[in-house]
Structures are given as structure tokens and as C-alpha cells.
A protein has these predicted regions:
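Conserved C-terminal helix/tail region of periplasmic/extracytoplasmic solute-binding proteins
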Residues: 276, 382-413
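Bacterial lipoprotein signal-peptidase II cleavage site
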Residues: 36-46
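Ligand-binding pocket segment of bilobal, Venus flytrap-like solute-binding proteins
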Residues: 140-142, 220-232, 241-308
């Protein structure tokens, strides 16, 4: 990491999905090809959506909006903390195209922050009405079934075709596009290798270390009900898909999670808080997204410390998140233009350089990324790092409520 980037990195409050330069990199491209995905040509200059890497069926199934006829007023974005406009950090990058456009004065952007996918869905279902929401793609069907989102107008999203099919597939429902993938990455433990030993769990990096009471009070996990249960399942079953659990397996994973709980300092809701806990000596292992690992590793207090991002034998958790359009927005066209700004190659590259974040957007991004070190740091040139059993991407869960109920029981115990 360059000296110029370090202050910006360490000062940022970004507390969401920190991944890296996957956009356009050879390793990810190979992985997507193996999954049947592709990366089609697109540009942010607009034009026929179908000609820009979007199928005619997708374009036809979407909506059609006219920004010029909309009433104005703030466009509210319900997103993860840190994804707002931060001019003091020089970081309005993901919204810059909209902010410099013709509608910003009449329809300025406004941000509110969610805690996790379950909380966001519950809040909007209870009557909160933002214009844009930032859920993970595995939850798209639930948002649609609840009547909370509507199809996208791909003519207002000219770079949508630059998102490979394998990434956007989960957001296409009944042929219509509902979800614009934005950020992609891993979830795993960041740990101090000088203080954590895996000798009691077979000598290799493993989620089982959470059961080792040697580190009681010095470890932490994210307060996400589904993730808590998936980790328990990976400990119980090894490298087995945690998206396909029976009720018996959920119950067993809950029991394992209950055994982990006494060893934890907390279940965190803000990654910024757990990063601070770590660098201040309160933790030696915590669940983070890649940006959390990068912040800890490069913090001045961690100088000469052997900070690692775990690659457990059971596999990392992984995710695709992005933006959906509220069914109740009065400005769907202008909200779509804000989404389009976040989907440009320039915005994707800036997220990588400034926050170690990558985008679902693949086209023309790699050459725009300045810090090539990030590609190596997060195995972007290694397709195997993204495939099972090394990584388990989120997927729709038919028994989602059972996962959540079990996770809630663990936290309440």
C-alpha cells in the first residue's frame, strides 16, 4: 500500500464488504467462466441495453422510467455504513456521476444505514420507504415476494451488461432484473498469527478455533443470524455447502454456536467497532470482510504484527450484494441514475483503491485500479479461491426463517 493511500484507508469509516480488485482480474474471470458466466462489453455512454451485454428478454422484462417527469425531492439510499458521499475523504466516487448530473440539485442524495440483511428487510416491511436499498443478492426473492421492490429499467443502467451473468443471475427473477450487483467478497476471521495457534484443531486454519477457550473473550463474530449458523455447520460438517441445511443440521449448528458464544467478546454490528477493538488489543481474532482485515493489517498499532486473513479448511463465506429499487419510490428514474453512477467502471476501481472493495461490474475496471498489490493480497489471480470448497457464496434459503430463528436463539442465550 502506498503512503498516499494509507491515511485515507485508516481514516475511513467504511464498515461493509471490503473486497478488492477482482473486477476484471484473470482469476475471477476464469472462475466465472467455469460457472457459465461471461463479461460482456458495455460502456457508461448509454444506448440500447440489449446491445450492451444485456439480453433482449431482460431489457423487455424491466420497467421504463422518465427522470425528467419526476417530482424531485431527496433520493434516500438505505445502505451499509460508509457508502455515503464523503467529500472530506475525497470519496464521492461511487456517486460522482450522479452528483455532477442534471438532477442532483432537485433530487439530492440522502443516506441512511442498515445493520444487516434481516434488519433491513424487516424495517422496510414495517413501513420505512427509501428509494434505493442495498441488500445481498441471496435475499432478492424475499424482497420481491414481500412486494417491496420493482424491476429495473436497464436503459437507465448502461453498464449493467458489464456484470457477468454468474454474478447477476440471482437477481433475475421470472426473467426480470431486480438487483444490480455492486460489491462482492469474502467473510472470514482476521487473526494475529503470533497469538493464535491451530494446534488443538488439527494444525490448519479452521473455524474450529472459535471453540478453543484458550482465547476466551478475545474473539468476536458478526451479529448476523444466518452467518452464525453457517459457521456452526461448517465446524460440524467440514467443507459442506452451508446453504443446504436440514432442520436437524440447523439444530446441530445452533448447539455448536452456543458452545462458541462463551469464548466471544461480542457479536459486533459495526465492523469499525471490531477493527478498533482489535487494534486496541481487545481482540486477537474477529470476523471481518476483506476491508476490515486490510485496515487491521495496515494500522500503525499493528506494525510488526503477523496479521492474517484465515483460509479455513471448511471454506470461507462469500457474498454478492447490490442495489434494488423500492416499489414505493416516487422517483424511480432518478434513483436509477444514482444506481447507474455506482455501476460505472470508474466507481468500481475507486472502491477497490480507496476501500479494498470490488464491484460486480467487471468491464474495463482492472486497468483503472491503481493499487495492484490488492490483487495478490486477496488471491484474485487464483480461481480456486472463489470456488467450493474454498468459498461458499450466499444463496437463497428456502428455510431462511429457520436459520434466523436458530441464530436469534444463540444470541439471546
Amino acid at each position: 500500500m502506498s503512503e498516499e493511500m494509507e491515511p485515507k484507508l485508516l481514516n475511513t469509516t467504511m464498515s461493509r464488504r471490503g473486497f478488492v480488485a477482482m473486477s476484471g482480474a484473470a482469476g475471477l474471470a476464469a472462475f466465472l467462466a467455469a460457472c457459465g458466466g461471461s463479461s460482456s462489453d458495455s460502456s457508461s455512454s448509454g444506448g440500447d441495453a440489449a446491445a450492451d451485454g444485456v439480453t433482449a428478454e431482460e431489457a423487455a422484462a424491466g420497467k421504463s422510467f422518465d427522470p425528467a417527469t419526476e417530482p424531485g425531492g431527496p433520493i434516500e439510499i438505505f445502505t451499509w455504513a460508509g457508502y455515503d458521499d464523503s467529500p472530506e475523504e475525497g470519496l464521492p466516487a461511487m456517486w460522482e456521476q450522479y452528483i455532477k448530473g442534471e438532477y442532483e440539485s432537485a433530487s439530492p442524495l440522502k443516506w441512511t444505514f442498515l445493520e444487516d440483511d434481516q434488519q433491513a428487510l424487516a424495517k422496510v416491511a414495517s413501513g420505512y420507504n427509501p428509494d434505493i436499498i442495498h441488500p445481498c443478492i441471496a435475499y432478492t426473492q424475499q424482497w420481491k415476494d414481500a412486494g417491496l421492490i420493482q424491476p429495473l429499467d436497464l436503459n437507465l443502467l448502461p453498464d449493467f451488461g458489464g456484470i457477468p451473468d454468474a454474478i447477476k443471475a440471482g437477481g433475475i427473477i421470472d426473467g426480470a432484473p431486480y438487483h444490480m450487483p455492486f460489491d462482492v467478497g469474502f467473510s472470514c476471521l482476521t487473526y494475529d498469527a503470533d497469538q493464535i495457534s491451530f494446534d488443538k484443531v488439527g494444525g490448519k486454519e479452521s473455524w474450529e478455533v472459535l471453540l478453543d477457550d484458550t482465547y476466551k473473550g478475545k474473539m468476536a463474530l458478526f451479529s448476523d443470524d444466518v452467518a452464525i449458523i453457517k459457521i456452526g455447520h461448517l465446524i460440524n460438517k467440514g467443507a459442506v455447502d452451508p446453504n443446504k441445511m436440514t432442520q436437524e443440521e440447523i439444530d446441530a449448528a445452533k448447539e455448536t454456536a452456543l458452545k462458541i458464544k462463551p469464548n466471544l467478546r461480542n457479536y459486533w454490528t459495526s465492523q469499525t467497532d471490531t477493527v478498533n477493538d482489535f487494534v486496541n488489543g481487545n481482540l486477537i481474532a474477529t470476523y471481518t470482510w476483506p476491508d476490515g482485515y486490510w485496515k487491521i493489517k495496515n494500522h500503525p498499532k499493528m506494525k510488526d504484527r503477523n496479521i492474517k486473513y484465515m483460509q479455513p479448511t471448511q471454506g470461507r463465506l462469500a457474498w454478492v450484494c447490490g442495489m434494488v429499487l423500492s416499489a414505493n419510490t416516487k422517483q424511480p428514474g432518478r434513483a436509477s441514475l444514482a444506481m447507474a453512477a455506482a455501476n460505472t467502471p470508474a466507481a468500481a476501481a475507486a472502491l477497490t483503491d480507496d476501500f479494498q472493495y470490488a464491484s460486480g461490474q467487471q468491464q474495463g475496471v482492472a486497468e483503472l485500479i491503481k493499487n495492484k498489490e490488492l490483487i495478490k493480497a486477496f488471491q484474485i489471480d487464483d480461481p480456486a479461491a472463489w470456488a467450493p470448497p474454498n468459498a461458499w457464496f450466499e444463496a437463497p434459503l428456502p428455510n431462511y426463517k429457520d436459520y434466523v430463528a436458530a441464530g436469534e436463539e444463540v444470541k439471546a442465550a
